[in-house]
Amino acid sequence: MMQNILLFLDLDDTLFQTKRKNQNGVIPATQSAKAGRGSYMTEAQGLLFELFHDSEKVKIIPTTARDFRQYQNTLLSQSPRIETAILYFAGMIIEKGIPDKQWQQHIHQAYQQLNLPISQLLTQFEQRVDNHPQFTLYNVDEYYITVKAETDCPKATQDGLFSQLKTLKTSEYFVHQNDRAFSLLPHFLDKRYAVKYLIEKYQPELTLGMGDSLTDWPFMQQCDFRIIPKEAQIESLFKIID
């Protein structure tokens, strides 16, 4: 049966999360969860995933900030029914584990046109982060730069460094901050563009977008229907009167 429904599915904090964020997570969602750490689904999240995964009409497309290695750590990435995924905030689209060549070329050209390349931005980050042992700096496969604070890092210390890092932002980049992580990404790394690309490629009869954060909302707006978890950050967009 033809998969004429596309579900663009954000992963972290939508389909699963760490125990620290939700103690009700009981179903391992990542390889590392089997060892007692990592991410888990609640019973409700597991049932929702099964609902779509078991339907022959639905093509699930994980739409995530995770890099390739982190995506491979998820258990759903091993499903033979999930062949396509959007990774690195849309920096890469994979089909059966192989990068989509047309999209890869498009992204490569966008990076070449940056006035401030990732390599130079990394140098600027290093100058500010190297003297702070409670933070770790990541060059995420040349796609973007992330700084993560240790779990025991005081909030005031975290906020202070992140405020300094915000001054490095230029018109070519935007800030993405999530819990203990601070990232600077080029504006073209946007899930909505990859979603639009795949909708045009597959020409589905129905599209669904599922996400929890404000940064997910633009890609969800490309879809016919949107699914939002309870108590999601996205709820702040709506002023609902009881």
Regions found by a protein language model. Name each.
Residues 2-60:
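Active-site neighborhood of HAD-like aspartate-dependent phosphohydrolases
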Residues 9-21, 88-90, 96-98, 140, ...:
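Short loop/turn segments at strand-loop or loop-helix junctions that form parts
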Residues 41-126:
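Active-site phosphate-binding/coordination module
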Residues 70-73, 194, 218-219, 236:
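Phosphate- and divalent-cation-binding pockets in alpha/beta enzyme and binding domains
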Residues 124-208, 214-222:
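Conserved acidic, metal-coordinating active-site core of Asp-based
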Residues 211-215, 230-233:
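Short, polar loop motifs at secondary-structure junctions
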Residues 222, 226-242:
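Asp-based, Mg2+/Mn2+-dependent phosphohydrolase catalytic module
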